Regions:
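Vicinal oxygen chelate
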Residues: 87, 96-140
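Short glycine-enriched loop/turn motifs at secondary-structure junctions
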Residues: 1-2, 76-82, 116
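Short secondary-structure junctions
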Residues: 24-31, 106-110
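Conserved short beta-strand elements that form part of the metal-binding/catalytic scaffold
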Residues: 27-79, 131-136
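Amphipathic alpha-helical segments
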Residues: 14-27
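Short acidic/glycine-enriched loop/turn segments that link adjacent beta-strands
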Residues: 33-35, 81, 115-120
Protein backbone atom coordinates (compact mmCIF):
# COMPACT_ATOMS: atom_id res chain seq x y z
CA UNK A 1 0.00 0.00 0.00
CA UNK A 2 1.18 3.56 -0.67
CA UNK A 3 -0.11 7.01 0.13
CA UNK A 4 -1.01 8.65 -3.18
CA UNK A 5 -2.76 11.81 -2.07
CA UNK A 6 -3.70 13.83 1.00
CA UNK A 7 -7.03 15.69 0.94
CA UNK A 8 -7.79 18.87 2.81
CA UNK A 9 -11.53 19.31 3.30
CA UNK A 10 -11.89 23.03 2.86
CA UNK A 11 -14.60 25.34 4.14
CA UNK A 12 -12.92 28.21 2.24
CA UNK A 13 -12.22 26.52 -1.10
CA UNK A 14 -11.29 29.49 -3.32
CA UNK A 15 -9.26 31.21 -0.60
CA UNK A 16 -7.47 27.96 0.30
CA UNK A 17 -6.62 27.19 -3.34
CA UNK A 18 -5.19 30.72 -3.77
CA UNK A 19 -3.19 30.32 -0.54
CA UNK A 20 -1.54 27.09 -1.74
CA UNK A 21 -0.89 28.50 -5.22
CA UNK A 22 1.09 31.31 -3.60
CA UNK A 23 2.91 29.15 -1.05
CA UNK A 24 3.79 26.30 -3.44
CA UNK A 25 4.35 28.59 -6.45
CA UNK A 26 2.56 26.17 -8.78
CA UNK A 27 -0.83 25.89 -10.44
CA UNK A 28 -3.04 22.99 -9.40
CA UNK A 29 -4.53 20.39 -11.71
CA UNK A 30 -8.31 20.84 -11.83
CA UNK A 31 -10.33 17.65 -12.02
CA UNK A 32 -13.83 18.93 -11.39
CA UNK A 33 -14.45 22.65 -11.38
CA UNK A 34 -15.19 23.83 -7.84
CA UNK A 35 -15.03 20.30 -6.32
CA UNK A 36 -11.32 19.60 -6.01
CA UNK A 37 -7.89 20.54 -7.26
CA UNK A 38 -4.62 18.71 -6.85
CA UNK A 39 -1.12 20.09 -6.37
CA UNK A 40 1.89 18.00 -7.46
CA UNK A 41 4.39 18.94 -4.73
CA UNK A 42 6.39 15.80 -3.93
CA UNK A 43 3.25 13.83 -3.23
CA UNK A 44 -0.21 15.00 -4.18
CA UNK A 45 -2.04 17.52 -2.02
CA UNK A 46 -5.70 17.98 -2.92
CA UNK A 47 -8.10 20.68 -1.80
CA UNK A 48 -11.66 19.32 -1.59
CA UNK A 49 -14.68 21.62 -1.53
CA UNK A 50 -17.25 19.91 0.72
CA UNK A 51 -19.88 22.51 -0.15
CA UNK A 52 -19.87 21.22 -3.74
CA UNK A 53 -21.00 17.76 -2.63
CA UNK A 54 -23.40 19.22 -0.09
CA UNK A 55 -25.17 21.20 -2.83
CA UNK A 56 -25.38 18.12 -5.08
CA UNK A 57 -26.65 15.96 -2.21
CA UNK A 58 -29.35 18.52 -1.45
CA UNK A 59 -30.47 18.15 -5.07
CA UNK A 60 -30.20 14.34 -4.79
CA UNK A 61 -27.72 14.02 -7.68
CA UNK A 62 -24.64 11.84 -8.25
CA UNK A 63 -24.37 9.88 -4.98
CA UNK A 64 -25.60 6.59 -3.60
CA UNK A 65 -27.25 6.20 -0.20
CA UNK A 66 -24.05 4.89 1.46
CA UNK A 67 -22.09 8.01 0.41
CA UNK A 68 -24.85 10.35 1.58
CA UNK A 69 -25.14 8.55 4.93
CA UNK A 70 -21.36 8.72 5.47
CA UNK A 71 -21.18 12.37 4.34
CA UNK A 72 -23.87 13.40 6.83
CA UNK A 73 -22.31 11.30 9.60
CA UNK A 74 -18.91 12.93 9.09
CA UNK A 75 -20.48 16.41 9.29
CA UNK A 76 -21.73 15.74 12.80
CA UNK A 77 -18.64 14.00 14.22
CA UNK A 78 -16.02 15.94 16.11
CA UNK A 79 -12.70 15.71 14.31
CA UNK A 80 -9.08 15.73 15.46
CA UNK A 81 -7.58 18.68 13.62
CA UNK A 82 -3.99 17.94 14.60
CA UNK A 83 -2.25 17.48 11.26
CA UNK A 84 0.94 19.16 10.13
CA UNK A 85 1.95 19.40 6.48
CA UNK A 86 5.74 19.35 6.31
CA UNK A 87 7.48 21.04 3.37
CA UNK A 88 11.26 21.09 2.82
CA UNK A 89 13.27 23.93 1.28
CA UNK A 90 16.99 24.27 0.58
CA UNK A 91 17.06 27.92 1.67
CA UNK A 92 14.95 28.51 4.77
CA UNK A 93 15.98 32.14 5.21
CA UNK A 94 14.92 33.01 1.66
CA UNK A 95 11.67 31.03 1.96
CA UNK A 96 10.87 32.67 5.31
CA UNK A 97 11.21 36.13 3.75
CA UNK A 98 9.17 35.12 0.69
CA UNK A 99 6.31 33.74 2.82
CA UNK A 100 6.31 36.83 5.07
CA UNK A 101 6.12 39.07 1.99
CA UNK A 102 3.06 37.19 0.71
CA UNK A 103 1.16 38.57 3.73
CA UNK A 104 -0.95 35.41 4.09
CA UNK A 105 -1.31 35.68 7.85
CA UNK A 106 0.72 34.95 10.95
CA UNK A 107 4.15 33.41 10.35
CA UNK A 108 5.95 31.97 13.37
CA UNK A 109 9.53 32.73 14.27
CA UNK A 110 12.16 30.33 12.94
CA UNK A 111 12.55 27.51 15.44
CA UNK A 112 15.48 25.16 16.02
CA UNK A 113 15.47 21.58 17.32
CA UNK A 114 18.47 19.25 17.59
CA UNK A 115 17.39 15.80 18.78
CA UNK A 116 18.71 13.47 16.08
CA UNK A 117 20.13 16.17 13.81
CA UNK A 118 19.84 19.96 13.40
CA UNK A 119 16.37 20.97 12.25
CA UNK A 120 15.11 24.49 11.52
CA UNK A 121 11.51 25.37 10.69
CA UNK A 122 8.70 27.88 10.82
CA UNK A 123 4.92 27.47 10.73
CA UNK A 124 2.05 29.17 8.93
CA UNK A 125 -1.67 28.38 8.90
CA UNK A 126 -3.78 27.94 5.80
CA UNK A 127 -7.28 29.53 5.64
CA UNK A 128 -8.83 26.37 7.14
CA UNK A 129 -6.42 26.36 10.11
CA UNK A 130 -4.11 23.56 8.93
CA UNK A 131 -0.48 23.89 10.01
CA UNK A 132 2.23 24.09 7.37
CA UNK A 133 5.73 23.46 8.69
CA UNK A 134 8.41 24.70 6.32
CA UNK A 135 11.78 23.25 7.23
CA UNK A 136 15.42 22.86 6.32
CA UNK A 137 18.48 21.23 7.81
CA UNK A 138 20.31 24.56 7.96
CA UNK A 139 19.66 28.24 8.42
CA UNK A 140 22.52 30.22 6.98
Amino acid sequence: MELVCTYIESENFEKTVEFYKKVLQIEPNEFCANRWVEFECGNKLSIYNKKYDEDKINNNINYNEAYIKNFNKLKSEKKNNIVTFNFYTDNLKEEYTRIQNLDLGLVSEIMYVNIVEPYYYFNILDPDGNVLEICSDNYE
